[in-house]
Regions:
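Short acidic DE-rich linear segments
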Residues: 99-104
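Negatively charged, low-complexity tracts enriched in Asp/Glu with abundant Ser/Thr
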Residues: 2-31
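Acidic, low-complexity, intrinsically disordered interaction modules
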Residues: 26-97
């Protein structure tokens, strides 16, 4: 179960990624959208954090960011923009289909 403190921390991460999304120029990066998804497994209470980049043309890149600090998330975004992480798509889709998405 997400505690109020945990929700506050996750909200900061979501808002950080939203703010970065607003300043990443699509014409130079081909990034259509950048977002931070949080899911909760209602059975175990465990939460999953994913950084998601949707590219112009339909490609997607996913990165698990469970427990990462904001500075590490920033580094992950840089890595995703440079080369991407496609191997975590299956994990993301399993979590997305089996867990409740937390809305901020």
């Amino acid at each position: 179960m997400l505690t109020p403190e945990r929700i506050k921390t996750l909200s900061k991460k979501v808002n950080f990624v939203k703010a970065l999304s607003a300043v990443i120029p699509a014409y130079q990066t081909n990034v259509e959208s950048l977002h931070y998804d949080v899911f909760e497994d209602e059975e175990t209470g465990y939460d999953y954090e994913y950084l998601v980049i949707d590219y112009v043309g339909g490609a997607h890149s996913y990165r698990s960011c469970n427990g990462n600090s904001i500075s590490v998330i920033f580094e992950e975004i840089a890595g995703m923009l440079d080369s991407g992480y496609y191997e975590e798509e299956r994990d993301y889709n399993v979590v997305k289909s089996s867990c409740r998405k937390i809305k901020f």
